[in-house]
């Protein structure tokens, strides 16, 4: 059987890729929206990484950075942006929390989310709203309207952040993100996206969508492992604050002989990471 690759309102059939996965002939798996099977190549990479840790004398300084930079580059090509805008994160919640920490709000403003939206893109906003004394506006699909129309209709001058997915996980409904971005621009609202249910399956062009922040967990359509994901931050947020004051995101952290002397602020975005990077 083949797979469908969706490129904005049309599907392109591609040849069977069963040989790339560890899927027996008597199994037809159709629930990648829940969790994807790992590619054989990904399973091999995980195994190779585990074996490397079992022989730590083989680990070089380059291992801390080179594969991360390669992953950032490849993901940037998928969504049509620059690698300097991408960080590696452990979860969607981590990325959304980073966005919430770096976006400005104002008095009497509101954050717009969807009814039944996945909670990773809800709980951080509830906390922000409580701390800042602002409102959460939950949008459901209006009668005789698409979900896109319902979102756009609900964005007003008081809207400061629109935090939505591309695909609603409970129904599979698709949101036209460029249309939402246009409305956000009219009221000067920030756009934050959870693309876990769509990135890798739907063509996603950040040059067109222009999100402020976007987050993807890799265990669905990205065909990757748990506890890995990507965070996109638009250039205007590159001087923002990370959730953790890790040494590896400091300037000149590649020089392991001076890790106790890293007094500069976070590394240049183009060097490796922007706001966060999981490390001990």
Residue ranges and their predicted role:
Residues 11-280:
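Pyridoxal 5′-phosphate
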């Amino acid at each position: 059987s083949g797979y469908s690759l969706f490129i904005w309102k049309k599907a392109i059939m591609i040849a069977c890729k069963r040989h790339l996965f560890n899927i027996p002939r008597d199994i037809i798996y159709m629930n990648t929206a829940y969790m994807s099977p790992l590619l054989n190549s990904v399973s091999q990479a995980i195994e190779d990484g585990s074996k490397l840790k079992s022989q730590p004398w083989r680990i070089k300084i380059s291992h801390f950075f080179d594969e991360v930079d390669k992953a950032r580059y490849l993901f940037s090509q998928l969504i049509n942006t620059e690698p300097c805008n991408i960080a590696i994160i452990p979860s969607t919640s981590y990325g959304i929390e980073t966005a919430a920490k770096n976006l400005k709000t104002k008095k009497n403003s509101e954050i717009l989310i969807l009814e039944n939206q996945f909670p990773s893109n809800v709980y951080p906003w509830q906390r922000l709203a409580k701390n800042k004394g602002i409102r959460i506006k939950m949008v459901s699909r209006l009668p005789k309207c698409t979900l896109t129309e319902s979102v756009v209709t609900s964005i007003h001058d008081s809207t400061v952040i629109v935090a939505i997915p591309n695909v609603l996980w409970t129904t599979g409904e698709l949101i036209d993100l460029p249309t939402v971005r246009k409305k956000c621009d009219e009221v000067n609202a920030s756009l934050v996206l959870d693309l876990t249910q769509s990135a890798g399956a739907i063509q996603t062009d950040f040059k067109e969508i222009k999100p402020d922040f976007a987050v993807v967990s890799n265990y669905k359509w990205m065909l990757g492992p748990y506890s890995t994901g990507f965070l996109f931050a638009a250039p205007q947020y590159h001087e923002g604050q990370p959730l953790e004051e890790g040494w590896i995101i400091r300037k000149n952290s590649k020089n392991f002989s001076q890790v106790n002397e890293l007094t500069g602020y976070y590394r240049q975005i183009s060097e490796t990471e922007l706001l966060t990077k999981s490390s001990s």
